[in-house]
Design a protein with these regions (language model features):
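Short loop/turn motifs at secondary-structure junctions and domain boundaries
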Residues: 42-46, 93, 157-162
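Histidine-rich, glycine-flanked metal-binding segment
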Residues: 10-81
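Divalent-metal coordination cores built from histidine and acidic residues
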Residues: 2-25, 102-163
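Short glycine-rich, polar/acidic loop-and-turn segments at beta strand-coil junctions
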Residues: 39, 57-59, 88-90, 116-118, ...
């Protein structure tokens, strides 16, 4: 049986990750991965830029000149960030979160923000807990909104109320 991590342990682990990311971005320690000679879009200046892209803890932490534990020369190819779908109802897809991730990731969506009001209307907090657990280790980052309409209308008998 796995030992559950303490709240203090979780905070300490997350803090250490953030400090590592800062050190990599500042160039004090090597990145986990560096994409050398990449072409990327500067969305603020609307320019194509060329340089290295540093990755640490699964995050892009800097562009410029970096060294990494792993370096891959991408030969000037264009590198794009993942897409974010800012409002979905994941359960409306009628597939499990795992299958949903398999469908959207190949098309460039790496993050979704979902409003789980449908499953919350039917199952209440058990449904929301299921969604949280089912999205925990997916290759797509799933964030949740607080459902604003549970129950959907005063006339509906949905089966659940969130207090």
């Amino acid at each position: 049986m796995a030992v559950k991590e303490s709240y203090a342990g979780k905070i300490n682990r997350k803090l250490n990750k953030k400090l590592h990311v800062i050190d990599v971005a500042a160039g004090r320690v090597p990145a986990d991965l560096v994409l050398k000679n990449a072409t990327y879009v500067n969305v603020f200046s609307n320019e194509l830029c060329r340089g290295d892209i540093a990755v640490a803890e699964g995050l892009i932490v800097g562009m410029g000149e970096y060294h990494g534990k792993v370096e891959a020369d991408v030969g000037g190819k264009i590198v794009l960030p993942g897409f974010i779908d800012a409002h979905i109802h994941l359960e409306s897809s009628l597939v499990s979160p795992k299958e949903f991730a398999k469908a959207v990731l190949p098309h460039g969506t790496t993050t979704v923000i979902t409003d789980p009001h449908e499953i919350a209307n039917v199952m209440g907090t058990d449904g929301i807990e299921y969604m949280l657990q089912a999205t925990e280790d997916l290759p797509v980052d799933v964030r949740f909104m607080l459902p604003s309409c549970v129950p959907a209308t005063p006339l509906d008998e949905s089966g659940a109320n969130l207090d």
